[in-house]
UniProtKB/Swiss-Prot annotation:
Mg(2+) binds at N200, D214. The keyword Ligase applies. ATP binds at K46, G53, R54, G55, E100, Y103, E108. The gene is sucC. Residues 9-245 form the ATP-grasp domain. Binds 1 Mg(2+) ion per subunit. This is Succinate--CoA ligase [ADP-forming] subunit beta. It comes from Neisseria meningitidis serogroup B (strain ATCC BAA-335 / MC58).
């Protein structure tokens, strides 16, 4: 689950991090009032969406009057912002953050942290190249990124934060200020189950003080059950409609750009299914894992979800019966096809627990369902049916 910039800044500020002042506005009048309240020579109006690249897409504007703040806010709110991180439809802008005048600054730095799966620990990354995409820095000048891995038994040590401060070229009081900032960020990361933390840029102001000009936070969705206050910050308008609906039924769904819908039990088998569809010349329309403990209701909902995508021209169902019984899946498929007006070819491959009984149920259903003998056969049949 991702947070908006204003939510991330509020959370980080509660842990003692110095953040750029800002006021949230939902319309032009509120933006104009926010400009007056901030009282600077100019302000920055930022569209609040769950996507990077806002500046290049026109979602971040410098304004020099209350009238301009109102005009920019009204031009953004109610529209969809398309960036390099969104699809062609973009993300809806429901509010803007009117931020204080902070420039000129001495320099812009970068500070971020992720859960590093290779070391199974939290790893901080810092760079003197702030204000640009860290991926670009990593690709072109990786030597300018400094990394610190945190031992979970002892936590982030002040000496580690000081070492990063030295590498960033900070001096005197700035070092202690940075140590406080980094240790606060670590505490926030652990206590709120962050998956991603990023401040870009971390500005060194003209007076030498540090300030978080932007804030990006991703929360581990698996931990939301123990983070009720964080869960309340979820903005469902920023999520894919079908992915959101899938989460309500505990289905793992990711929309793709192909035309062959996939329903599979198990993430590994789902990825293998997409691979073989590609190998046979097809394009998967989605990743959909109904899980090892799939129920009849979940399979019906999964089928509905796939067919809601108008680009789907065929469906491949690939089930390995281990925990789940193939006959139960077959009954659910028959129920779903009868309930929904299915006018695309459906190929079903069942293996494992009660697979023969499941195939019998499908064959005796009287519906236009094609059985497959093995994954290779299933992929060939669905690709041929879609291309027919």
């Amino acid at each position: 689950m991702n947070l908006h910039e204003y939510q991330a800044k509020e959370l980080l500020a509660s842990y003692g991090l110095p953040v750029q002042g800002g006021i949230l506005a939902h319309n032009g009048e509120e933006a104009a009032a926010a400009y007056d309240k901030l009282g600077g020579k100019f302000a920055v109006v930022k569209a609040q969406v769950h996507a990077g690249g806002r500046g290049k897409a026109g979602g971040v504007k410098v304004v020099k009057s209350r009238e301009e703040a109102k005009e920019v806010a009204e031009s953004l709110i109610g529209t969809n912002l398309v960036t390099y991180q969104t699809d062609a439809n973009g993300q809806p802008v429901n509010s803007v953050l009117v931020c204080e005048d902070m420039y000129p600054v001495q320099t812009e730095l970068y500070l971020g942290a992720v859960v590093d799966r290779s070391t199974r620990r939290i790893t901080f990354m810092a760079s003197t190249e702030g204000g640009v995409e860290i991926e670009k820095v990593a690709a072109e000048t990786p030597e300018k990124i400094f990394k610190v891995t945190v031992d979970p038994l002892v936590g982030l040590q002040p000496c580690q934060a000081r070492e990063v401060a030295f590498q960033l070229g900070l001096k005197d009081k700035q070092i202690n200020e940075f140590v406080k900032l980094m240790t606060g960020a670590y505490k926030a990361f652990v206590e709120n189950d962050f998956a991603l933390f990023e401040v870009n840029p971390l500005a060194v102001r003209e007076n030498g003080a540090l300030a978080c000009v932007d804030g990006k936070i991703g929360i581990d969705s698996n931990a939301l059950y123990r983070l009720p206050k964080i869960a309340e910050l979820r903005d469902k308008s920023q999520e894919n409609e079908r992915e959101l609906k899938a989460s309500e039924f505990d289905l793992n769904y990711v929309a793709l750009e192909g035309n062959i819908g996939c329903m599979v039990n198990g993430a590994g088998l789902a990825m293998a299914t997409m691979d073989i569809i590609k190998l046979k010349g097809g394009q998967p329309a989605n990743f959909l894992d109904v899980g090892g403990g799939a129920t009849k209701d979940r399979v019906v909902e999964a089928f509905k979800l796939i067919l809601e995508d108008k680009s789907v021209q065929g469906v491949l169902i690939n089930i390995f019966g281990g925990i789940v019984r193939c006959d139960m899946i077959a009954e659910a498929i028959v129920a779903a096809v009868k309930e929904i007006n299915v006018n695309v070819p459906v190929v079903v491959r069942l293996e494992g627990n009660n697979a023969e009984l499941g195939a019998k149920i499908l064959n005796e259903s009287g519906l236009k369902l094609t059985s497959a003998d093995g994954l290779n056969d299933a992929a060939e049949k669905i690709v041929a049916a879609v291309n027919a």
